[in-house]
Swiss-Prot record:
Lineage: Bacteria, Pseudomonadati, Pseudomonadota, Gammaproteobacteria, Alteromonadales
Gene3D superfamilies, per the entry: ABC transporter type 1, transmembrane domain, P-loop containing nucleotide triphosphate hydrolases
Listed name of the protein: ATP-dependent lipid A-core flippase
Gene: msbA
Record remark: domains: In MsbA the ATP-binding domain (NBD) and the transmembrane domain (TMD) are fused.
Span of domain ABC transporter: 359-596
Keywords attached to this entry: ATP-binding, Cell inner membrane, Cell membrane, Lipid transport, Membrane, Nucleotide-binding, Translocase, Transmembrane, Transmembrane helix, Transport
InterPro entries cross-referenced by the UniProt entry: AAA+_ATPase, ABC1_TM_dom, ABC1_TM_sf, ABC_transporter-like_ATP-bd, ABC_transporter-like_CS, ABC_transpr_lipidA, P-loop_NTPase, Type_1_exporter
Quaternary structure note: Homodimer.
Biological source species: Shewanella denitrificans (strain OS217 / ATCC BAA-1090 / DSM 15013)
TM region(s), chain numbering: 28-48, 80-100, 159-179, 182-202, 267-287, 295-315
């Protein structure tokens, strides 16, 4: 049975509170500020009646133990009436301080909640299996980091304000109205032009900070998208910590910009209210003037009318909070479902510094989740340390699937096993297994950083400039790097957009060269390149394959003629195997593919 909406909301709310409770000091301050705000609103309306009725009474009265003899109208005790503006200013100042405390604290809670949830979601992405990232829409993944988390914080803040402050205000005003009896009459409150000046200044500040927030948000989105696009490389090269730190920096910058906006909001609102209090104070002061005596109205009427007007906005807020709260709950549900997604299975405990590189597929069959047709069927081959096996075949035949299984990007074999140095790859820890493998694919992922840092990305520890230079030289990348104005320090742009395809490929080869892993996977590393680039890259790949166990997936058969063994894959099965010469002589499927490419 599915949980009822009420139970689901309760569960989500309790889980959301686990993010807020570490900041319970700020939460307490915000609630106290909201309570004081609501009480001051009610108290101010309550003071209107005694100020008017007692101050303007025809007969002597006693207020707070002080006798107020009056001769009628405006000639009543002027000391009391002169004190009224000071009381009003004091109350509104207290109200402004309470509003500042509550608004700033809630903004702090919201900004910290956004930052914490975004960081948690981002780091969870780094632990998710490739299968999850492949089947999800990248836009939805980014939206959960950027939009959903912000919706949660916004809804939480709005709900807290309405439930505490507006509820107390409404209850207080209703109590006053029922206490004084029901009356309704005119109401006009004119706010001076000074408020317009303040609003104009603050609006300009809001616009400026909003632009900065949009820029910071762009950094968050770009970093997230970059990680998602390069998810395999991040996992393969163990770059989770690097990506987490990179995201923390842009995430924290976004939080800082939001706090600048919060400060402007927190200051502007009490300033406007204090200015308004001076306007009201002037009205009360003017009431003590002789010319205003005959225009005075009853205190009860003024108090009830004031209570009615003061109650309108809180009621509107309370009617809106449910819709806002529901949007927040929906966003919470989406984010929590993501966080509840199981990370990559990492039950293996086998650790090794460096394997020999003996790789074996032992009658492996595999199907993708939800697919009835197997992607691989009874795949059986053996690669000795330092040898090269090439996989050829039409697109969709299962070649890249085999590469994904070696790195455990996909798991769940239907039968058989994959062994590395006679140990099942599922017995290795993920970190240990992937540290033995270097991956170079057709779709090169470069990060928005320098060439040197992109090459060093694959290295597990500190790397020297000399090591980077050596790797770039062996990859034949220095040929173009030396022509760049800043050499290795040249920024490559987002995903290497400032470099050509061949240049990006050579940086990827240098990255794998620096990693110095005993097992190498080349997945279409030279496809879709011009002849000149292919020659330079092929030289780099030849250096890279030296003394490494290599799995080469290729469409261009000229690049794998020297392989120790060539496997022809068709519909998930090995239909031919042998050396280039033997397969040509056999005149089978491989010879047919070769004939198609070279017409020989």
């Amino acid at each position: 049975m599915t949980a009822s909406p009420k139970n689901e909301m309760s569960t989500v709310f309790k889980r959301l509170m686990t993010y807020v409770m570490p900041m319970k000091g700020m939460l307490t301050l915000s609630i106290l500020g909201l309570i004081v705000y609501g009480l001051v609103d009610a108290a101010f309306i309550a003071f209107i009646k005694p100020f008017i009725d007692e101050g303007f009474s025809q007969n002597p009265t006693v207020v707070a133990g002080v006798e107020l003899p009056t001769s009628g109208g405006f000639s009543a005790n002027k000391d009391v009436m002169l004190m009224a503006p000071l009381v009003v200013i004091g109350m509104f100042t207290l109200r402004g301080v309470a509003n500042f405390v509550s608004t700033y604290c809630i903004s702090y809670l919201s900004a910290q909640l956004i930052m914490d949830m975004r960081q948690q979601v981002f780091e969870h992405y780094l632990r998710l299996p490739v299968s999850y990232i492949d089947r999800e829409n990248s836009g939805n993944l980014i939206s959960r980091v950027t939009f959903d988390t912000e919706q949660i914080a916004r809804a939480s803040g709005s709900a807290l304000i309405s439930i505490v402050r507006d509820s107390i205000t409404v209850i207080g005003m209703l109590a006053l109205m029922f206490f004084y009896s029901w009356k309704l009459s005119l109401c006009i409150l004119v706010i001076g032009p000074l408020m317009g000046v303040v609003i104009s200044i603050v609006s300009k500040r809001f616009r400026k900070v909003s632009v900065q927030i949009q820029s910071a948000m762009g950094g968050v989105t770009a970093t997230t998208e970059q990680m998602i696009k390069g998810h395999k490389n991040v996992l393969s090269f163990g770059g989770q910590e690097t990506e987490s730190k990179r995201f923390y920096e842009v995430n924290d910058r976004n939080r800082y910009q939001n706090m600048k906006l919060a400060m402007a909001q927190s200051v502007s609102q009490p300033v406007i209210m204090i200015i308004g209090s001076f306007a009201l104070a002037f009205v009360l002061y003017a009431a003590s003037l002789d010319s205003m005596k005959l225009e005075l109205t009853a205190g009860t009427f003024a108090a009830i009318l004031g209570a009615m007007l003061a109650m309108l906005q809180p009621i509107k807020n309370l009617t809106r909070v449910n819709a806002e709260f529901q949007r927040g709950i929906a966003a919470c549900t989406t984010v929590f479902e993501l966080l509840d997604t199981l990370p990559e299975s990492d039950t293996g405990a086998h650790q090794v510094e460096r394997v020999q590189g003996h790789l074996r597929f032992d009658n492996v069959s595999f199907s993708y989740p939800g697919q009835a047709k197997p992607a691989l069927n009874n795949i059986d081959f053996d690669v000795k340390p330092g040898k090269t096996v090439a996989l050829v075949g039409r697109s969709g035949s299962g070649k890249s699937t085999m590469a994904s299984l070696i790195t455990r990007f996909y798991t769940g074999l239907e039968q058989g096993d994959i062994r590395l140095d006679d140990v099942s790859i599922y017995d290795y820890s993920l970190k240990s297994l992937r540290s033995q493998v270097a991956l170079v694919s057709q779709q090169v992922t470069l990060f928005n950083d320098s060439i040197a840092n992109n090459i060093a990305y694959a290295y597990p520890g500190e790397v020297s400039r000399e090591q980077i230079l050596k790797a770039a030289t062996l990859a034949h990348a220095m040929e173009f790097i030396e022509q760049l104005p800043e050499g290795l320090d040249t920024q490559v742009g987002e995903n290497g957009v400032l470099l050509s395809g061949g240049q990006r490929q050579r940086i990827a080869i240098a990255r794998a060269m620096l990693r110095d892993a005993p097992v190498l996977i080349l997945d279409e590393a030279t496809s879709a390149l011009d002849t000149e680039s292919e020659k330079a890259i092929q030289l780099g790949l030849d250096n890279l394959r030296h003394n490494r166990t290599s799995i080469v997936i290729a469409h261009r058969l000229s690049t794998i003629e020297s392989a120790d063994e060539i496997l022809v894959i068709d519909q998930g099965k090995i239909i031919e195997r042998g050396t280039h010469a033997s397969l040509i002589e056999k005149k089978g499927a491989y010879a047919g593919l070769y004939q198609m490419q070279f017409g020989e």
